[in-house]
Amino acid sequence: MANLFDQLKEFTTIVADTGDVEAIKSVKPYDATTNPSLLLKASTLPQYAPLIDEAIAYAKSQSGDKAQQIEDAADKLAVLIGQEILKHIPGKISTEVDARLSFDTDAMVQKGRKLIKLYADAGISKDRVLIKLASTWEGIKAGEILEKEGINCNLTLLFSFAQARACAEAGVFLISPFVGRILDWYKAKTGENYTSETDPGVLSVRKIYAYYKEHGYKTVVMGASFRNTGEITALAGCDRLTVSPNLLERAEGYRRYLPRVLVDNGATKQRPALLTEKEFRFDQNEDAMATEKLAEGIRGFVVDQNKLEKALAEKL
């Protein structure tokens, strides 16, 4: 019998959640995603030293201002790592916008355009890149603007139904609801152990998937942040799942039959009126888990962005 990975590929697109090219070569995913934490980790790998040198040289050629050089080097490095990954996958790479911009729509739009231009300068068309944005109200609005310019977006750090609904209504290409981090929060709060069928993260993605399909939204649902293979099997049939290399490797040993769980039965319901900003903010605030995990996620990415920039600054 085929392993979990091979069975899952029959009805779900598998995406590698890593910046490590060697891991990508090994698991052969369709797409790949990166974020500041993964880029920081990747930047310590010896095979990336030439890319760091190239990013530094690029930054020095663009500006004499140290702060601008640091920003340019970080952006260039993200794109260089993305370029390297694209050599080994047939699909798209997700490259994240600086999390410090998460509450500034205009700044996120400008950064998204800049990243796409850096890819274009390297001969990579925008249809192979997803710009990752935090699913704040401002991030969702930035995604809406970029999508209208033909720049596809991946709205990440998504923990609530309000975020998912606003993303669909904005017409973004893809969302990344975080399964494992939702589970983490509930386990910490309740002290309970959850099965894959009672896992709050799994149930959240199932609800979002069903809502999108029955209302005819085209936004792709890509489950993310998995803690175990049970969460993955419980979401078999989801549009896409982005999985870390270690979980993908574990899936190699799974030899049981994998049934499809999520099924698209077509649009059957009329779409509601668009969610207003006031409604979004209230609904998000009512969800303590989503409020805490979104804030925590942004802070975590900012910490790693700062660490990456500090390491780059030492080389400038």
UniProtKB/Swiss-Prot annotation:
UniProt keywords, alphabetically: Cytoplasm, Pentose shunt, Schiff base, Transferase
Catalysed conversion reaction: D-sedoheptulose 7-phosphate + D-glyceraldehyde 3-phosphate = D-erythrose 4-phosphate + beta-D-fructose 6-phosphate
Disulfide bonds: none
Pathway where it operates: Carbohydrate degradation; pentose phosphate pathway; D-glyceraldehyde 3-phosphate and beta-D-fructose 6-phosphate from D-ribose 5-phosphate and D-xylulose 5-phosphate (non-oxidative stage): step 2/3
Subcellular location: Cytoplasm
Biological processes, Gene Ontology terms: carbohydrate metabolic process; pentose-phosphate shunt
Gene Ontology CC entries for this record: cytosol
InterPro entries (UniProt xref): Aldolase_TIM, TAL/FSA, Transaldolase_1, Transaldolase_AS
Protein's job: Transaldolase is important for the balance of metabolites in the pentose-phosphate pathway.
The protein, known as: Transaldolase
Gene behind this protein: tal
